[in-house]
């Protein structure tokens, strides 16, 4: 990854314009051709530097206003299997293993999004049934101060 790739990533992280020539402005700013922009983006995607290109949906604007961080006490020897099962649920947007602490037994964290808090609770029940994990707690968000992806 060279300096031009880094500059290109900084440009596209704010979104790609919906126009007939979406990469023209990037090419102009970088002093390269549109085809080189496309080629570089393809190479960055192949190298795993860009996961995918997709629309970013404002979930609150379409009515998905409830979200809960679910914390799960998963036996260490089951963490891989259980984590993979939880990650398959479409309502789960994040699934992370984290360390346990003396007064905190939970080691797997998921973010569940749905239309209502009750729907989030139902998703947690389905996850519990699918994994056999019964020791869990949900924390519902009350207010969002910031939400963004990683920025360069």
Curated annotation (Swiss-Prot):
Enzymatic reactions: siroheme + 2 H(+) = 12,18-didecarboxysiroheme + 2 CO2
Pathway field: Porphyrin-containing compound metabolism; protoheme biosynthesis
Keyword field: Heme biosynthesis, Lyase
Keyword Lyase: yes
Chain ranges passing through the membrane: none
EC number: 4.1.1.111
Classification via InterPro entries: AhbB-like (IPR053431), AsnC_trans_reg2 (IPR040523), HTH-Siroheme_Decarb (IPR050684), NirdL-like_HTH (IPR053953), Tscrpt_reg_AsnC-like (IPR019888), WH_DNA-bd_sf (IPR036390)
Gene Ontology molecular functions: lyase activity
Swiss-Prot/TrEMBL GO biological process terms: heme biosynthetic process
SUPFAM superfamilies for the chain: Winged helix' DNA-binding domain
Inhibition and activation profile: Binds heme b. The redox state of the heme b modulates the activity of the enzyme. Activity is stimulated by sodium dithionite.
Signal sequence bounds: none
Class in the EC hierarchy, top level: lyase
Pfam families named among the record's database cross-references: AsnC_trans_reg2 (PF17805), NirdL-like_HTH (PF22451)
Top-level lineage group: Archaea
The protein's role, per its UniProt record: Involved in siroheme-dependent heme b biosynthesis. Catalyzes the decarboxylation of siroheme into didecarboxysiroheme.
Assembly and binders: Forms a heterodimer composed of AhbA and AhbB.
Family the UniProt entry places it in: Belongs to the Ahb/Nir family.
Name this polypeptide is given: Siroheme decarboxylase beta subunit
Species, as recorded: Methanosarcina barkeri (strain Fusaro / DSM 804)
């Amino acid at each position: 990854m060279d300096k031009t790739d880094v500059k290109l990533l900084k440009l596209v992280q704010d979104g790609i314009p919906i126009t007939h020539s979406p990469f023209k402005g990037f090419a102009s700013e970088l002093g390269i051709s549109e085809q080189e922009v496309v080629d570089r983006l393809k190479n960055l995607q192949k190298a795993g530097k860009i996961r995918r290109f997709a629309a970013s949906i404002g979930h609150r604007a379409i009515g998905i206003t409830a979200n809960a961080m679910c914390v799960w006490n998963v036996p260490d020897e089951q963490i891989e299997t259980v984590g993979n099962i939880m990650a398959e649920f479409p309502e789960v947007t994040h699934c992370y293993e984290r360390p346990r602490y003396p007064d905190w037994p939970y080691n797997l964290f998921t973010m569940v999004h749905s239309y209502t808090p009750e729907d989030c609770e139902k998703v947690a029940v389905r996850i519990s049934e699918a994994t056999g994990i019964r020791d869990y707690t949900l924390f519902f968000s009350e207010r969002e101060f910031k939400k963004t992806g990683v920025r360069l």
